[in-house]
From Swiss-Prot:
Bound cofactor: record note: Binds 1 lipoyl cofactor covalently.
GO biological process: glycine decarboxylation via glycine cleavage system
Residues modified as N6-lipoyllysine: K60
PROSITE patterns found in the cross-reference section: BIOTINYL_LIPOYL, LIPOYL
A Pfam match: GCV_H
Quaternary context: The glycine cleavage system is composed of four proteins: P, T, L and H.
Listed cofactors: (R)-lipoate
Domain Lipoyl-binding intervals: 19-101
Entry function: The glycine cleavage system catalyzes the degradation of glycine. The H protein shuttles the methylamine group of glycine from the P protein to the T protein.
SUPFAM superfamilies for the chain: Single hybrid motif
Organism name: Beijerinckia indica subsp. indica (strain ATCC 9039 / DSM 1715 / NCIMB 8712)
GO CC terms in record: cytosol; glycine cleavage complex
Name listed for the protein in its UniProt record: Glycine cleavage system H protein
Amino acid sequence: MSITRYTKDHEYIRVEGETGTVGITDYAQSQLGDVVFVELPAIGKALTKGGEAAVVESVKAASEIYAPVSGEVVAVNEALAEAPGTVNEDAAGKGWFLQIKLADAKELDGLMDEAGYQDFLKTL
């Protein structure tokens, strides 16, 4: 069973066991516009919660993607190199950025669940 949590910077992490899949929300991709490039971290890189994990460039701007939790990068979505627009087409599915092995699952406690994230969007 997986759980999904969200940050106020519009990243999501979908956790199964000790591994989390990280990407940006549909709201984030809609604000960015057409994604033209994604810079992903190296596999094995240690990420710190709130630290830069990736960069996404759109026709409007370049934006940092922050790690929702601390941990080690165990996989990246290499398909985004050839098809960065996948982020726009399926942000919560095939448009994921990286997978991280969680250093401390308790860090998830500070993130929002789906209902909390939807409430947060209403304040924007």
